[in-house]
C-alpha cells in the first residue's frame, strides 16, 4: 500500500495553554520544550496546533513535549519570538466524529498581524489588529479568522485592519490576555475564502 498521511484539521477551540520551558537552536531550526496538561496525553508523531501552527510531537517527558520549527515557519509566524515563559495555545487535531465548534483550521499561518489597540469594555475586550492589505480579500465582516490558533469573529473591517471581541472565558483560557499593542500574532484566514479567492484569480486569467 502507498505510504500516505492524512493531514490534521483543527477548529480554533483552544484546549489548554502550554508554557515554553526551553528553546534550543538546532542549525537553522528552533526546538521548543512545552510544559502543558496535555503533554502526557500526546503521542510521538502526533500533530498539535501551537499558537495556530501545526507542529509534530517529537519527544515527551515529565509532563512536557518537544517540537521543532523550521526556518520557513520561523519567518512566517511569531514562533521566533518565543522564549522561556511564553504561553502557547494548544489544540489537538479534530477527530472525525468531533464537533466543529469554531471553524475549520489547517494550522498553516498565512501572515502575522500587529496588535494596534486593546479596549477594555468592562466585561469584554476589543482587540484591533493591522494586517498586510494584500490579504484584504480573505476577510469579510462577521467572518471567521484564526488568531494564535483561536477561532474569532471579525468586525469593523478595513482594507488593513480589523477588530475582534473577546469574552471573559476566551480571555482567561487562551493566551490572548498576554497580547499587548505592538505584539505580533499568527493569522490564518478562512480556508473557504482562500479557495474562492484562488478560483476567482484563475478565472480572471482565462
Regions found by a protein language model. Give the residues of each.
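Conserved loop->alpha-helix
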Residues: 4-206
